[in-house]
Design a protein with these regions (language model features):
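Extended beta-strand/beta-hairpin segments
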Residues: 1-38, 48-128
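Alpha-helical metal-binding/catalytic segments enriched in His/Glu/Asp
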Residues: 43-44
Length: 128
């Protein structure tokens, strides 16, 4: 399946457009690597949610962080995902599915070719 984004760059604007016509601007604090981290979080959740499960989930939040190398090429050196589950009825099943997702998520696997990867799961219900 082909995925497409078209970048447009002038002195005044920097953005890319997706096939649905959505314009995504590159601004201070929302450049290519922020979009990459968003793509990682989105792909990871989509893969996780597609897994067959017995338990119920109320909410899942995924924070993706990447640290770039300081030498050229400045690819990611270390990437981490913090996955926070709320209202997870079967925590053991959820953790097992997260591990399986790390093996199957295409964006996670692509980034893992250049970066060390960490995944941390925590449950907010446990902190109340």
């Amino acid at each position: 399946m082909t995925r497409t984004a078209t970048g447009h760059f002038t002195e005044k604007e920097r953005f890319f457009i997706t096939p649905d016509g959505t314009k995504h601007e590159y601004k201070e604090g929302s450049g290519p690597y922020e979009y990459l981290m968003g793509a990682l979080a989105g792909c990871f959740y989509s893969t996780l949610a597609s897994m067959e499960r017995k338990g119920e989930w109320k909410e899942v939040s995924i924070t993706a962080n990447g640290i770039k190398r300081t030498v050229v090429p400045t690819t990611l050196e270390h990437t981490s995902l913090e996955i926070v589950g709320k209202g997870i009825s079967d925590k053991n099943e959820f953790e097992m599915l997260v591990k399986k997702t790390a093996e199957e998520c295409s964006v996670f696997q692509t980034i893992s070719k250049v970066s060390a990867m960490d995944v941390v799961v925590r449950f907010e219900d446990d902190e109340e």
